[in-house]
Curated annotation (Swiss-Prot):
It comes from Phaeosphaeria nodorum (strain SN15 / ATCC MYA-4574 / FGSC 10173). Regulates the cell cycle in a nutrient dependent manner. This is Cell division cycle protein 123. GO terms for molecular function: ATP binding; magnesium ion binding; protein folding chaperone. The gene is CDC123. It holds the Pfam family D123. GO terms for biological process: cell division; eukaryotic translation initiation factor 2 complex assembly. It is found in: Cytoplasm.
Length: 381
């Protein structure tokens, strides 16, 4: 489990330290007023430039429980009044990073809320795109309310002492087939696997090359520099597969998805001691055309036994999705589906600005008819 002090400062320490091997990103400090906005009920978005403050079409009052009356819409206030400097800083940062970014709070990205985005992805072009994802995400809500539930020291932490930041990364399109999740225990890379749970046949022919590239990256960049000895990290290894990029870092905790492993496996995996791993491995070298044995070797049975007893170098376990894996048939299920709303709501969100409003009206009508039917049934009884 992560240490509280390390967990608090992860985002502050890791971004500048690993800038050379991560996608371009910026940190935006978040004041208490903005955190209160994220925790508040309902999804009220600030007005776009030139617009009047109003309810977002993506919300239409559904999530706040408000009625869709014109009076309520007109009375809606700009929620960014108390954190206008932060709003403007986010606008500037988006522009600085090329107009498209992917957001993340200290420890979690709102990946479970991408269904709310018009692109069905983490790509955000405006501050309101970011706010919509953050306020719709169970992952972000957990970070705000239960950030330290899975730390080694679960003592209470004053929210005012937690330096919350919004991490905005320049949006780049990644090939999901060469994204990998890596698991570090006691500063040892013990396992890695695909992040995208689909079968990619070409990965098997280059499994050793990919593992060596990630192992070398970890030894050089992370092993002795990351503040916590136990953590997971995600990497991207694009063609020609010799350059490794650090995409994300996550806590060694149950809420981090182990993907092709289980947490019990990772916690109990047999790993050799560092001293044992660093012992000299004897290699037998042979010249072309020779048997690789000297006269002394041929006369010494003890030496023959030693040559047969060559130690193997331990390597982290690397799991890929196999074509015939029976569990792979379930991989087509959308990620984070447990965090999403019913299909009717999702479909409505894809119909443009009026889709959610129309669905809200249909929902209210269905509720009214159901209530009317219950009343009639009660009178009949």
């Amino acid at each position: 489990m992560a240490n509280i002090e390390n967990r608090v400062h992860w985002v502050i320490l890791t971004l500048p330290r690993y800038r050379a091997v991560t996608p371009k990103a910026r940190l935006v400090p978040l004041p208490a007023a903005f955190l209160d906005y994220l925790r508040s009920d309902g999804i009220i978005l600030p007005p776009e430039d030139g617009d009047n403050p109003t309810w977002s079409d993506n919300d239409s009052g559904i999530f706040s429980g408000a009625d869709n009356n014109d009076e309520d819409d007109e009375a809606a206030a700009d929620p960014s009044v108390d954190w206008r400097d932060t709003h403007e800083a986010i606008e500037r940062t988006i522009e600085e990073l090329g107009g498209k970014v992917a957001p993340k709070l200290n420890w979690s990205a709102p990946k479970d809320a991408t269904w709310m985005n018009a692109t069905n992805s983490m790509e955000c072009r405006t501050p309101n795109d970011i706010y919509l994802l953050l306020k719709s995400s169970d992952f972000v809500t957990h970070d705000l309310a239960h950030a330290f539930d899975d730390t080694a020291d679960q003592s209470s932490e004053d929210d005012q002492e937690i330096p919350y930041h919004l991490v905005l990364r320049k949006w780049i399109t990644l090939n999901p087939s060469v994204e990998f999740r890596c698991f570090v225990r006691d500063r040892r890379l013990i396992a890695l696997c695909q992040r995208d749970l689909n079968h990619f046949d070409f990965l098997f022919n280059m499994q050793d090359k990919l593992r060596n590239a990630v192992q070398d990256f970890f030894e050089l960049r992370l092993r002795n520099t990351f503040p916590d000895p136990n953590f997971t990290f995600d990497v991207y290894v694009p063609p020609p597969h010799d350059k490794v990029w650090l995409v994300d870092v996550n806590p060694w905790a149950l809420r981090t998805d182990p993907l092709l492993f289980s947490w019990m496996e990772l916690l109990t995996m047999d790993v050799p001691d560092v001293e044992q791993e660093e012992t000299t491995v004897r290699l037998r070298l042979a010249q072309p055309g020779s048997s690789g044995r000297t006269g002394a070797d041929e006369s010494s049975g003890a030496d023959d036994s030693e040559d047969d007893d060559i130690e193997e170098i331990w390597q982290p376990e690397f799991r890929l999705v196999r074509r015939d894996d029976p569990e792979a048939y379930g991989f087509a299920t959308p990620q984070y589906s447990a965090h999403k709303l019913p299909k009717d709501v999702v479909d409505a969100s894809k119909d443009g600005g009026g889709g959610m409003r129309e669905f809200a009206q249909q929902w209210e009508e269905a509720q009214r008819l159901a209530e009317q039917q219950r009343a009639e049934d009660s009178e009949t009884d």
